[in-house]
Amino acid sequence: MSAIKYNYKNRDYILEFSRRTASIIERNGFRYQEVGTQPNVMIPLLVYGAFVKNHSNLKQGKIDEIYDSVKGKNAFVMKLVELYLETVNTLMGDDDDEGNVNWEEV
């Protein structure tokens, strides 16, 4: 899956999602469809979720500080939504994947 590499104050951060981190933000109320209508709630959840997989030791204040330094926030948030959706799509799979188990209705 894709990720974002971000350097802040000479430290690299890798932002990405896993099913676990996507689940964490969903349980806290994240809905990607509401990023545009409730940005004050959804964007901090989305950004937090992107950091959790590889940087779970970061406190929310530090995550906010790093996010505040981002250039092109709109494109950045849209890319995070894309990364989140990639993770969600892994639950649906692809029927063409070799080695997938077949199922049938009985």
Q: Model-found features: residue ranges?
A:
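Short, isolated positions in well-ordered beta-strands
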Residues: 13-15
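Charged interaction scaffolds used for protein-protein
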Residues: 1-7, 22-23, 30-33, 37, ...
